[in-house]
């Protein structure tokens, strides 16, 4: 049943990735941290118009990037990370992005979510990226009972076939923004309400507020 529901989410909320080059996926994902998609796209476009390769970015100073990526927020920190990542890629990996989770996690500012997105979008490897949306929705539906995104990732890998690991992230993000919102979720409009533990608990008065997981 969980697999069927997951496929329905992917079907209703398809997410197409405009960029698939591993380096650009990596840098864009770093820029996407704590900001909206439209801000990420604007910042990425401006950045890659000036700096097209790891080699070019490795020679830059963080302050050279400020105006280009300002729209992404936290631009000073992100600029430092992007330059440092680029230098490491050039010095240690010959200008290539590593295609293993272990190596990606060694890069500054790269956590499991970012690494898994790079593996899936950039290398088409089965990888399951879990952000706050995926973590929240999976728990609300009752698919998992976990406390952290890391625990959710491991639990979902056991529940879903590999072909769903990649697509489920982007689709759940859209589902979480439109329907299963962090606050005031649109439960009555949701196509999954008859299969949702959170909805059943609300009906029984067990959920005290609309923000509870």
Curated annotation (Swiss-Prot):
The keyword 4Fe-4S applies. Keywords: 4Fe-4S, DNA damage, DNA repair, DNA-binding, Glycosidase, Hydrolase, Iron, Iron-sulfur, Lyase, Metal-binding. Binds 1 [4Fe-4S] cluster. Its EC number is 4.2.99.18. Its cofactor is [4Fe-4S] cluster. It catalyses: 2'-deoxyribonucleotide-(2'-deoxyribose 5'-phosphate)-2'-deoxyribonucleotide-DNA = a 3'-end 2'-deoxyribonucleotide-(2,3-dehydro-2,3-deoxyribose 5'-phosphate)-DNA + a 5'-end 5'-phospho-2'-deoxyribonucleoside-DNA + H(+). Pfam families: EndIII_4Fe-2S, HHH, HhH-GPD. Coiled coil: none annotated. SUPFAM superfamilies: DNA-glycosylase. Residues 101-120 form the HhH domain. GO terms for molecular function: 4 iron, 4 sulfur cluster binding; class I DNA-(apurinic or apyrimidinic site) endonuclease activity; DNA binding; DNA-(apurinic or apyrimidinic site) endonuclease activity; metal ion binding; oxidized pyrimidine nucleobase lesion DNA N-glycosylase activity. InterPro entries: DNA_glycosylase, Endonuclease-III-like_CS2, Endonuclease3_FeS-loop_motif, Endouclease-III_FeS-bd_BS, HhH-GPD_domain, HhH_base_excis_C, HhH_motif, Nth. Signal peptide: none annotated. GO terms for biological process: base-excision repair, AP site formation; nucleotide-excision repair. The keyword Transcription regulation does not apply. [4Fe-4S] cluster binds at residues 180, 187, 190, 196. Belongs to the Nth/MutY family. NCBIfam families: nth (TIGR01083). DNA repair enzyme that has both DNA N-glycosylase activity and AP-lyase activity. The DNA N-glycosylase activity releases various damaged pyrimidines from DNA by cleaving the N-glycosidic bond, leaving an AP (apurinic/apyrimidinic) site. The AP-lyase activity cleaves the phosphodiester bond 3' to the AP site by a beta-elimination, leaving a 3'-terminal unsaturated sugar and a product with a terminal 5'-phosphate. This is Endonuclease III. It comes from Thermotoga maritima (strain ATCC 43589 / DSM 3109 / JCM 10099 / NBRC 100826 / MSB8). The lineage of its organism: Bacteria, Thermotogati, Thermotogota, Thermotogae, Thermotogales.
């Amino acid at each position: 049943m969980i697999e069927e529901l997951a496929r329905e989410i992917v079907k209703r909320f398809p997410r197409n990735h405009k960029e698939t080059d591993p380096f650009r996926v990596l840098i864009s994902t770093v820029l996407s941290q704590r900001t909206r998609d439209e801000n990420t796209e604007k910042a990425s476009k401006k950045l890659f118009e000036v700096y097209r390769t790891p080699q070019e970015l490795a020679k830059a100073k963080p302050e050279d990037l400020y105006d280009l990526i300002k729209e992404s927020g936290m631009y000073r920190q992100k600029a430092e990370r992007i330059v440092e990542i680029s230098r490491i890629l050039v010095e240690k990996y010959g200008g290539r992005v590593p295609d293993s989770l272990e190596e990606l996690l060694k890069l500054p500012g790269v956590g499991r979510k970012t690494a898994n997105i790079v593996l899936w979008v950039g290398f088409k490897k089965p990888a399951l990226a879990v952000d706050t949306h995926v973590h929240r929705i999976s728990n609300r539906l009752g698919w998992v009972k976990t406390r952290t995104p890391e625990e959710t990732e491991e639990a979902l890998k056991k529940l879903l076939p590999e072909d769903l690991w990649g697509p489920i992230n982007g689709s759940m993000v859209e589902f979480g923004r439109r329907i299963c919102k962090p606050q005031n979720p649109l439960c009555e409009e949701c196509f999954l309400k008859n299969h949702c533990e959170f909805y059943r608990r609300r009906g029984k008065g067990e959920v005290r507020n609309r923000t509870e997981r």
